Amino acid sequence: MSRPQRITVLGATGSIGLSTLDVIARHPDRYQAFALSGYSRVDELLALCVRHRPAFAVVPSAEAAARLRASLAAAGCATEVLEGEAGLCQVASAAEVDAVMAAIVGAAGLRPTLAAVEAGKKVLLANKEALVMSGALFMEAVRRSGAVLLPIDSEHNAIFQCMPGDYARGLSAVGVRRILLTASGGPFRETPVEALLDVTPEQACAHPNWSMGRKISVDSASMMNKGLELIEACWLFDAAPAKVEVVVHPQSVIHSLVDYVDGSVLAQLGNPDMRTPIANALAWPERIDSGVAPLDLFAIARLDFQAPDEQRFPCLRLARQAAEAGNSAPAVLNAANEVAVEAFLERRIRFPEIAGMIEQVLDQEPVVPLPSLDAVFAADQRARELSREWLRRHGR
């Protein structure tokens, strides 16, 4: 019998990371945790290390590393502690690693995810920002290295499952007419537009269907999450933005659909639980038990669909415009959104101001080519500086 696959989980203490470890723990004969990373939740990372006994753990700073080393020693756990971006890149590209779960949220996940790609790993991509920021460079690295890129976002994983195996030949060549990206509409789908001025971070983070971290919950509430997913879908499936349509589907049971030229529409259904796409990607091309309950169609009884309201969700419009503009526009969009969401969570701006701030930054920052990773981070930094300048003028 072959040895278990060694998995690095980047972002182990987050929602995706914990779900990944849940699936791994269900199949100890197939998978083992090789390395786990965490950001601010050092105590939670300690507990995960004690339970899963990885070879390495990665934290952001020397201070956090010293604290974790002392705690691991006291617990009798031999996990080696690394720190910073260099540590993340090391465990993402290590020769012993078979697959990498890339689940660090935001721009911070780009370099370690790219390190895994360049090392030719099987990369389970939950960090959509990596593709949004550096799509052309990222996909070229995938082609050059021979890495296997498998999407973890439930929507992109659904599309992947509904696509023919040779979709890389081009959507037209395999008879795909369009991709239908489903969205729940979030907690404010029916909130009067004028009432959005007064919604709180707690309300924005109370998603009706999914359990997620705070940043992605706010992105879901603003539908920026769907906008970022639209951009990601364009890169993953080599689709023009016009070929990707967003459909609001409140039940979050159909995770996305692929429309073919012969009139067939293939959909992937399942309970809203991230362990399904995680298990699908971990085992691909095989199937394993994820721990998710079977879908009860009789309990669901109905499936509803509606067009997205761009007056209520201007972030979706901004993301589509950025996708169409290409070059640096998606990286600028992403950076401005990260700053805006953080400001909203800190109660420095109101919910509708997230889109207002992003739009102003997009208007101010010219669209330029991004020929290198340095150029990507330069565009990201300029957008963050413009965003902070906007906050100084307009924030509370």
UniProtKB/Swiss-Prot annotation:
EC main group: oxidoreductase
GO biological process: isopentenyl diphosphate biosynthetic process, methylerythritol 4-phosphate pathway involved in terpenoid biosynthetic process
Positions in coiled-coil regions: none
Reaction(s) this enzyme catalyzes, per UniProt: 2-C-methyl-D-erythritol 4-phosphate + NADP(+) = 1-deoxy-D-xylulose 5-phosphate + NADPH + H(+)
Molecular function GO terms recorded: 1-deoxy-D-xylulose-5-phosphate reductoisomerase activity; manganese ion binding; NADPH binding
Any Pfam family the entry gives: DXP_reductoisom
Enzyme nomenclature, EC number: 1.1.1.267
Cofactor(s), by name: Mg(2+); Mn(2+)
Binding locations of NADPH: 13-16, 127, 129, 213
UniProt keyword Acetylation present: no
Binding site for 1-deoxy-D-xylulose 5-phosphate: 128, 154-155, 184, 207, 220, 225-226, 229
Family assignment from sequence similarity: Belongs to the DXR family.
Function: Catalyzes the NADPH-dependent rearrangement and reduction of 1-deoxy-D-xylulose-5-phosphate (DXP) to 2-C-methyl-D-erythritol 4-phosphate (MEP).
Protein name: 1-deoxy-D-xylulose 5-phosphate reductoisomerase
